[in-house]
Design a protein with these regions (language model features):
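Residues in the short beta-alpha loop(s) of Rossmann-like NAD(P)-binding domains
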Residues: 5, 73, 99
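Rossmann-fold NAD(P)-binding glycine/threonine-rich loop
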Residues: 72-90, 104-109
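Glycine-centered, small-residue-biased loops immediately flanking beta-strands
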Residues: 65-66, 144
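Helix-to-beta-strand junctions that scaffold the AdoMet/dcAdoMet cofactor pocket
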Residues: 61-63
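C-terminal hydrophobic helical "lid"/dimerization subdomain
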Residues: 55-59, 101-153
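Short glycine-rich anion-binding loops that position phosphate/pyrophosphate groups of nucleotides
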Residues: 50-51, 73-75, 153
Length: 153
């Protein structure tokens, strides 16, 4: 997992992520290439609103690999991609938005299963009256998920 927030990387480890890379501290392309003995990853999912991350993602994939742009960037923001690299390395590029009914069902089943420890995502529990604090914590990256209780003070 590649992230710029150390708290999120630490949380990812709790869910069994094998490798974490803070892209503020090291070049993510070099790090992925090193982890894969120079080959690149089979699949790369860019799930963030960064055009830079999208541009970097293609260089993390192996020849004939798959790159998925899951997180949308700001409206009007354009990502510059090296289409020569994409073409000559036979990369498959997909954009993904939303989900179908089967994906929703599988997600629901996972979320309620004993295998998925959803409470690990919850970093803050606040009363509804502190909604602005919850938003600030999330925007600043200090919170993973905030739960708001409507009847608490």
């Amino acid at each position: 997992m590649i992230e710029i927030n150390d708290n999120r990387l630490k949380t990812a480890k709790q869910f069994g992520v094998d490798h974490t890379i803070n892209s503020l501290n090291e070049d993510p392309i070099d790090a992925v290439r090193k982890l894969t003995n120079g080959k690149g990853a089979d699949k790369v999912i860019s799930a963030n609103p960064s055009t830079q991350a999208q541009a970097q993602a293609i260089f993390m994939a192996k020849r004939t690999g798959i790159v998925v742009f899951f997180g949308g960037v700001a409206k009007g923001a354009l990502t510059e991609l090296d289409t020569n690299y994409i073409h000559y390395n036979g990369l498959w590029i997909y954009g993904h938005y939303g989900s179908n009914s089967m994906q929703v069902q599988k997600s629901f089943e996972l979320a309620i299963s004993d295998e998925f420890e959803s409470e690990k995502f919850i970093t803050h529990i606040l009363p509804l009256s502190e909604i602005n604090k919850g938003i600030s914590l999330t925007k600043s990256g200090k919170a993973i998920k905030v739960v708001l209780h409507p009847n608490d003070q």
